[in-house]
């Protein structure tokens, strides 16, 4: 059975593990398809402390949330959400951002991320948010396919270079 719940402070170490697995997976994808972008995702030496503080602030924030997914009472993934300010020239003042989605590899393709997405949309709606966005590396084909199934569409194509 799939259960989705709000994260608690005692979940932070678990979320840190999930975030590390997510990062390691992204490094593999980046190394394979676009190694020139490794510079963009290089971690600071004290990233764990920084991430711990960030996660704690998101758990307590009115403008952020973290959801944990459990499969048969075992935590198997998470989603981090935030509310972002739009550029001041736009009518839309705020939008929702899905910052992170991670499901342990052995539990994928079971509808768990979709359940997380459903809870995220409920949370955003409760905050009167009408638009939701996320970032995804273009080489992460599996994630892109999932997000398209959720109804997300491409909006901006970001390009980078080293100077």
Language-model-derived ranges and their functions:
Residues 100-103, 109-122, 149:
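Conserved acetyl-CoA-binding loop-helix of GNAT-fold acetyltransferases
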